[in-house]
């Protein structure tokens, strides 16, 4: 699904990612752990080109999305991302937050289809003709129905018309996750989704992520939650100083780490 080849990222003289090559297959749940400053979050942000790689390839569905000639927005629709600090719009209600991107993307697609229909009628047959197209009102109604169903899934349908400022951190993060799901992504990237939460709120977010794992959602997760890595990951990767030092299945990774650096890290966090 995603094939990263010789990925490098530099900020001036600071070489953050160093020749990273890794494949992520459909249905995998890859958990990335490591000390702060090891490049984990930068790697994640490069995967959907929120950060432009200095060099290397990120091949998604056969296309190098790191190539600046590629329309990255076409591919970002298929790669969801959940941030550490939720990134909800405080001036919009919960349901508006969930609906915003799906409505914008679908409206844009309909406008393009209408343009193609017009060109087709003028005789430019290379443009596809779409028989029936939804109105803006129909798009909004459909996306609202989908957003409501997602809120019901996490038991927060009564929060639909409330604003993010009235929610707990755990509620905000679960809404951020279903906002990503509303785009029907093929893969979701999680950047330390529980690190900004109070300890008592962590469990509800991890449970939702475990549910997604059971549904075989492709996930790449940067986290310090070792329990989640053990239970939900299909593969665990250890990063340090911009490199992927070690990777293995959770059972083998935690019971029999190979590198001294990984052994030292696990000895400090598994207490």
Each language-model region and where it sits:
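Conserved ABC ATPase "signature" region
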Residues: 64, 99, 103-158
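ABC ATPase NBD coupling module
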Residues: 65-80, 104, 134-144, 214, ...
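Conserved ABC ATPase signature
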Residues: 163-167, 171
């Amino acid at each position: 699904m995603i094939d990263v080849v010789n990925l490098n990222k530099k900020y001036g003289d600071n070489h953050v990612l160093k020749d990273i090559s890794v494949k992520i297959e459909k249905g995998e749940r890859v958990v990335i752990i490591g000390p702060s400053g090891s490049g984990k979050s930068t790697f994640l942000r490069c995967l959907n080109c929120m950060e432009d790689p200095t060099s290397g390839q990120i091949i998604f569905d056969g296309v190098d999305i790191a190539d600046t000639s590629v329309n990255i927005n076409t591919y970002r629709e298929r790669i969801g991302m959940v941030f550490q600090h939720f990134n909800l719009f405080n001036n919009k209600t919960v349901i508006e937050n969930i609906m915003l991107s799906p409505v914008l993307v679908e409206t844009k697609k309909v406008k393009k289809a209408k343009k193609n229909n017009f060109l087709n009628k003028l005789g430019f047959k290379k443009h596809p003709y779409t028989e029936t197209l939804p109105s803006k009102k129909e798009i909004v109604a459909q996306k609202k129905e989908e957003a409501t169903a997602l809120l019901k899934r996490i038991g927060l349908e009564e929060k639909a018309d409330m604003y993010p400022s009235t929610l707990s951190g755990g509620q905000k993060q679960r809404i951020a996750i279903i906002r990503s799901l509303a785009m029907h992504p093929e893969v979701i990237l999680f950047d330390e989704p529980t690190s900004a939460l109070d300890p008592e709120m962590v469990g509800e977010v991890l449970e939702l992520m475990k549910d997604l794992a059971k549904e075989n959602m492709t996930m790449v997760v940067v986290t310090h939650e070792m329990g989640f890595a053990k239970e939900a990951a299909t593969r665990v990767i250890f990063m340090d100083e911009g490199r992927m030092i070690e990777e293995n299945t959770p059972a083998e990774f935690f019971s029999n780490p190979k590198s001294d650096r990984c052994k030292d890290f696990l000895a400090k966090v598994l207490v």
